[in-house]
Amino acid sequence: MIPVGCSFRISRHPCGYNKNVMELVQIDPARTIPAPKPEWLKARAPVGENYHDLKRLARSLNLHTVCESAHCPNIGECWQHKTATFMMLGNLCTRRCGFCAVPKGRPDAIDFDEPRRVAEAVAKLGLLHAVVTSVNRDDDLVGGARAFAMVIDEIRRQAPGCRVEVLIPDFQGNKEAIRTVVEARPEVLNHNTESVPRLYRVVRSGARYERTLELLRYAKELWPAGITKSGVMVGLGEETSELLEVFRDLAAVHCDILTIGQYLRPSRDHLPMARLYTPREFAELKTEALKMGFRHVESGPLVRSSYHAHEQAASTGLTVLT
């Protein structure tokens, strides 16, 4: 755990070795926790009839949403519009990424009835675009992939005409697991890059930048007609030049949709926020990314992977694919 008021800095080894070194450095709280919050970072409070109906539905079917588990700031807006990202494979993640609020621990065995219940919720909500994600299950990679394939099939059965978007973990690069998901033909396959390579060891515990790119490349190779997508957080200490290099790498593996959003520290136990990006900076990043050939770029302070996911997919010209 990182001590309060500190952060990691990654620098070149002092002896010139070709490797990065992590060291603990003091962080100025005034820089990491801005006050008051600017207007463009204020989200709608989670209230309203639809919000409470969706919450009751999730509870009645024993389902989790990443909206709640990850403390998403857009939960009020999205749930009021009856859109949610369902999170499968339990509510305990086997990894300890420094940015993520999802609980960590040793999960129970995978519940293979969960895909049916997720599809039931999708059908009851009348969704035209469903987003499903999961925690990391490094204890059962192939089982986790099978659950994704099952939920895609179940949604097609219970909610015909609904597009399916999956936000998947990296499955530790397991090709069988990745192929299992892709062969179920989700209309959109999302796997987030999250940060720049230099910060991976701090931001994404257990992940590798090259593995992320290879997953997206392999998914597109297996099904060229499918839409691939990835997201990046800003405000963790990255440089603009590093972000642009990530965008170029994603474009090189033919990633179709890119999302860019502000990292917001979930609690004092998580990585400090290095700085806030302004709406103008997000607009500039979007302009640069579009020049690289992405079919859609969603860029803004409150943007998250599945924020306006339906509109993102529609902007690519995507229709329901089977």
Model-derived features: where do they sit?
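A secondary-structure boundary/capping signal
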Residues: 68, 88-89, 133, 167, ...
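Conserved functional loop/turn residues at catalytic and ligand-binding sites
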Residues: 92, 96, 101, 126, ...
